[in-house]
C-alpha cells in the first residue's frame, strides 16, 4: 500500500511539474510582451511639446509601470532620422508620403505603423498694427519676391510649418529662402511683436487652451489673420479645424518602425482612448476620435476671450 502511494505521488510529480513550469513561463512571457510596462523615448517635433507633455501623466496614471519621455527636434530631422533608422518611433505634424514610408520600411526592416490621433493647425499672426486681416496662401511668392513691406517669419529653416506653407503655396524652395528663419516659436512671437509688417506662423496648440496664461497672452497681444485658399476665406477655430475647413490643418501622428520598446505601442494605443480625447478637447484641439456626447468645439476664434 505504501509502495502504491509512493508510485502515485511520483506519477503526479512527473505530470504536474511540466504543467507548473509551462504556467510560469507563460506568465513571464505575458509580462515580457505587456505593452504598458517599461520605458520609451519618442523623438518628436518640438512644436508638439505642449500637446505631448500633457498626455504623459494621464497615461502613466493608468499604467504606473510604464514611462514615456520625448526627445524634441525639428520635424525635418525627426523624419530624416526615422527614414534612416536613426530613430524608430516619431511624433510629427505631417502625413508621411508613400515614398517616405517605403524608404523607412526598407531601412527599418519593418512595417511602418501610422497612428493619427489628433489635429492641430498653423495659426497666422501679425502685429496689432498690421493693416491686412487675411493671409492669401497663393500670394506667398509675392511676399517673398516683391518689394512688399510684409515679411514672412518662421521658427527655423527645418520647420515643418515652413515646409507646409511652401508646399501648399507651391513656392519654389529657392524663392522660399527669402523668408525669415529664426530659432524658435518664441523668437517668432518676439519678432512679430516688435515689427509692424511681420507675418508669423506658429502652432495653434500654443494658443488653443484659453485657460493657460501663455495662450491668454498670445491671444491678447497679437492679431490673427484669416487664411484665404482657393477663393475661400476661413478663420482659425476649433470648429474649422474639426470640420477640415481651415486650409492649414495638420495631423498629429505617431509613426512606429522597428521599435523594441513595447511601451511605445502601448502609449500610442492609449492616445485613442476617451481620456485622451477629452483632454485634447479641453485644451482646444481636435482628437481624431471625439467622445460621444462630448462634442463641444468652439465655433469662433475670439482672441480677446480668455474664459
Features from the language model and the residues they span:
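Exported/periplasmic ABC-transporter solute-binding proteins
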Residues: 3-4, 21-63, 83, 112-120, ...
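Pocket-flanking alpha-helical
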Residues: 76-107
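Short, conserved beta-strand segments within well-ordered enzyme catalytic domains
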Residues: 43, 69, 88-91
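Short beta-strand and adjacent tight-turn residues that come in two discontinuous sequence segments
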Residues: 73, 91-100, 183, 201-204, ...
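Sec-dependent bacterial lipoprotein signal peptides
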Residues: 1-19
Amino acid at each position: 500500500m505504501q509502495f502504491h502511494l509512493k508510485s502515485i505521488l511520483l506519477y503526479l510529480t512527473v505530470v504536474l511539474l511540466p504543467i507548473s513550469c509551462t504556467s510560469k513561463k507563460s506568465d513571464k512571457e505575458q509580462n515580457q510582451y505587456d505593452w504598458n510596462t517599461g520605458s520609451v523615448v519618442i523623438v518628436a517635433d518640438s512644436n508638439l511639446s505642449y500637446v505631448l507633455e500633457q498626455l504623459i501623466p494621464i497615461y502613466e496614471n493608468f499604467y504606473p509601470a510604464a514611462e514615456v519621455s520625448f526627445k524634441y527636434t525639428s520635424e525635418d530631422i525627426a523624419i530624416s532620422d526615422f527614414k534612416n533608422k536613426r530613430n524608430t518611433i516619431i511624433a510629427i505634424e505631417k502625413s508621411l508620403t508613400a515614398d517616405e514610408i517605403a524608404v523607412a520600411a526598407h531601412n527599418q526592416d519593418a512595417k511602418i505603423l501610422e497612428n493619427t490621433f489628433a489635429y492641430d493647425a498653423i495659426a497666422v499672426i501679425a502685429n496689432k498694427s498690421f493693416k491686412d486681416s487675411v493671409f492669401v496662401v497663393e500670394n506667398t511668392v509675392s511676399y517673398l519676391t516683391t518689394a512688399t513691406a510684409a515679411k514672412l517669419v518662421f521658427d527655423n529653416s527645418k520647420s515643418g510649418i515652413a515646409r507646409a506653407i511652401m508646399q501648399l503655396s507651391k513656392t519654389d524652395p529657392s524663392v522660399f529662402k527669402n523668408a525669415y528663419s529664426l530659432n524658435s516659436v518664441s523668437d517668432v512671437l518676439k519678432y512679430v511683436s516688435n515689427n509692424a509688417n511681420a507675418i508669423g506662423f506658429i502652432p495653434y496648440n500654443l494658443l488653443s487652451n484659453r485657460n493657460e496664461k501663455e495662450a491668454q497672452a498670445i491671444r491678447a497681444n497679437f492679431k490673427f489673420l484669416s487664411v484665404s485658399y482657393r477663393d475661400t476665406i476661413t478663420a482659425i477655430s476649433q470648429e474649422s479645424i474639426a470640420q477640415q475647413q481651415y486650409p492649414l490643418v495638420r495631423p498629429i501622428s505617431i509613426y512606429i518602425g522597428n521599435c523594441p520598446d513595447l511601451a511605445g505601442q502601448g502609449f500610442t494605443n492609449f492616445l485613442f482612448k476617451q481620456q485622451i480625447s477629452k483632454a485634447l478637447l479641453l485644451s482646444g484641439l481636435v482628437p481624431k476620435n471625439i467622445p460621444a456626447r462630448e462634442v463641444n468645439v468652439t465655433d469662433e476664434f475670439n482672441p480677446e476671450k480668455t474664459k
